[in-house]
Structures are given as C-alpha cells and as structure tokens.
C-alpha cells in the first residue's frame, strides 16, 4: 500500500490501530514501513509524451488504461500502471528507491 506522504502522520497511526485490532481477533497480519520505496504520478495530457522519453523500448501508447507492467524507467526497474486520479491520462511509477527517478 502506498499512502500519500502529506498524510503519513495520520495514516500510519490509523493503520497501526486497525492492524492491532485485526491481530487481536486472531488473524495474522503485519505492517512494514519502507521509507525508500515510493510512487511518482505523471498526470495530464502530455503524461505519455513526458514518460516516453524515460522508457526506451516501451511503446506507452499501446498500454491500455488500468494496465500494469514492469519496465525500466530512467535506468531503474519500476512497476508502472496507466491510471490516474485527476481525470486526465496518467501513469503511476513505483520504485524501490524512488530517488533514482529524479
């Protein structure tokens, strides 16, 4: 799960409280914070054009909405989905060490 970094101070305690209740009920679950992992969203009418420059060998125009693929972005292996929450076309790029995308 990726949470919005701007809400981390509220979301993490909320998840931890529900996790504790879940475990008390006899179910098995755990939570691990991975601060170096992250997600970058590229949204808007030029999203595919902007991202295409960073993914040689991949034809983003062939990637359908809500499709997902592992691909090399700017030299790093990433998990990319064609999705968005803005109402515009977009991509969400997940990486183990998000700083490598900058």
Regions found by a protein language model. Name each.
Residues 1-101:
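Basic, glycine/lysine-rich polyanion-binding surfaces/domains
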